[in-house]
Amino acid sequence: MISSKTSNRICLCSPQQTARITGIVVSSRPAYLTGLGYPVSLRLSSAVSQSSSQHTRSFSSTRAAHLKDFFPVKETAYIRKTPPAWPHHGYTEEEMLAVVPQHRKPGSLSDWLAWKLVRLCRWGTDIATGIKPEQQVDKSNPTTAVAAQKPLTEAQWLVRFIFLESIAGVPGMVAGMLRHLESLRRLKRDNGWIETLLEESYNERMHLLTFMKMCEPGWFMKTMILGAQGVFFNAMFLSYLISPRITHRFVGYLEEEAVHTYTRCIREIEQGDLPKWSDPNFQIPDLAVTYWKMPEGKRTMRDLILYIRADEAVHRGVNHTLSNLNHKEDPNPFVSDYKCDADHQRPNPALKPTGFERSEVIG
């Protein structure tokens, strides 16, 4: 959390210790952020009162004057500011509230394979980020159920967000890179796919940078991210070479999980299960305000998660749709200009969680 008054560097070893430093009343029983028995340390930028700091002798703190930004902008003699390569188009509140978790049922063996691989990734992520059985949702409806016996803590959510977003930007970059090389080899246009895929990857990275403004993973989490990214990049690389269709379906299912994750977080904020994020004085990073062009009065943590969830809903619809197209010949319907026909206009991927069929967007 970014505060204009005070910033403390904290070595966070458990959700309970996070609760102590932020004034949240929790039990004193120790717990770990990872299911592997290792504590995940985070450096949090947070406004902390004097009364709280008097009871945190186990933490090493750095005064605000000595606390550096995690990724500061380097000052140059001439350049004042570097704007985003892909400015965000923004959403209306109605569009963001209309996003709901949905699941596209597998219609073929390849779809079923992609779905099961995503479920395997979800299982591994739950273990890696320390999600306990009582914190898991109904396994019979894993993509749509958002209620659990016990909510996650703010620290658990941040660990989960950072881990997920650190690899979520990989698929779009891999697919865009391979399509770029294919276009060069075939001496043919790509028909607009590359731009959308790279923009998706860029958008996911902005999600990560936003959460990194709130906390920094410790060495163990960084090691996990390094390993996961290496495995995931190579897996996506080989997968896209073999079958772009299956890969886009896999990413579509992965984005279903992302929409589900952020929907559950919004629900827990609204129910008051995350008191620090429900605090009206909680300040989201300026990076987020600038990127999403968030208006005054709509800059709470809930609003931030609404914007990010809407992004994931767009990625969900885009990838499910691209999986239905001929990846060698069909143009990208989301950047194409359509003929003057009221019945066929540029589709909005957020409005079709299961993706558009080829006949709906190509003809």
From Swiss-Prot:
Coiled coil: none annotated. One of its GO terms (molecular function) is alternative oxidase activity. GO terms for cellular component: mitochondrial inner membrane. Fe cation 1 binds at residues 165, 204, 207, 312. It is an enzyme of class 1 (oxidoreductase). Fe cation 2 binds at residues 204, 255, 312, 315. Catalyzes cyanide-resistant oxygen consumption. May increase respiration when the cytochrome respiratory pathway is restricted, or in response to low temperatures. This is Alternative oxidase, mitochondrial. The gene is AOX1.
